């Protein structure tokens, strides 16, 4: 994985060596995501933020089918705390690489990633 890439019509942007960010992923995308070298998916989207988003359980179960780990560190607006940043940072530290972070647009995920880089 050397640069940004597409899975179906979803742009997955490179943040750092083994870290990528995107908008909301869908269940059928996970197989192709796994084939691109992603080993960990981290959701930063709260459950039920949108009626059409898959649940964390659905995403976790689908990810397991392709040997991809799924974690969730949800937040919105002012609910981002130092504890969540530290939890997020620990998840990435324990990862074997190939990390995909997502939320509704990718913006929140980029923010928490940046803060974790600066603070940890």
Regions found by a protein language model. Give the residues of each.
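Cys-dependent protein tyrosine phosphatase-like superfamily
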Residues: 1-100, 111-120
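Short cysteine clusters
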Residues: 103
